[in-house]
Design a protein with these regions (language model features):
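N-terminal alpha/beta PP-like core and its mobile active-site loop of ThDP/TPP-dependent enzymes
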Residues: 8-126
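Aromatic (phenylalanine/tyrosine) cluster motif
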Residues: 2-6
Length: 126
């Protein structure tokens, strides 16, 4: 989670990476986010909590999430945007990403990641 805690100075205000993520989503016109929370993405969920311009859809499983985002993109013509945690959260998206890819459906998927120091140590999730 530490990589979302970096702050940059913008004028006299420090801006967290999570705030920049939310600002980037808004700048790209994202108004709906399909998401499933988990430890490695919890900081992003905290930043999105008070954001009322982006509707968050929280299904009960990542596979439902990716297929819902696919259906959303097909029915609205907008990009389906997803946010999940690392490990199984990410791998549960694979079939839905492949389905969307075969039909040229636009999806953007974000996943959490374990801290850099834990990579390569079988730490795929919390």
């Amino acid at each position: 989670m530490f990589h979302f805690l970096y702050e940059i100075e913008r004028g006299n205000k420090m801006i967290k990476g999570t705030e920049l993520f939310v600002k980037a989503l808004k700048a790209e016109g994202v108004d709906t986010l399909f998401a499933y929370p988990g430890g490695q993405a919890v900081d992003l969920f905290d930043a999105l909590y008070d954001e009322h311009e982006i509707e968050m859809i929280l299904p009960r499983h990542e596979q439902a999430l990716i297929h819902a985002a696919d259906g959303y993109a097909r029915s609205t013509g907008k990009v389906g945007v997803c946010l999940v945690t690392s490990g199984p959260g990410a791998t549960n998206l694979v079939t839905g990403i492949a389905t969307a890819n075969y039909d040229s459906v636009p999806l953007v998927c974000f996943t959490g990641q374990v801290p850099l120091g834990l990579m390569g140590n079988d730490a795929v999730q919390e």
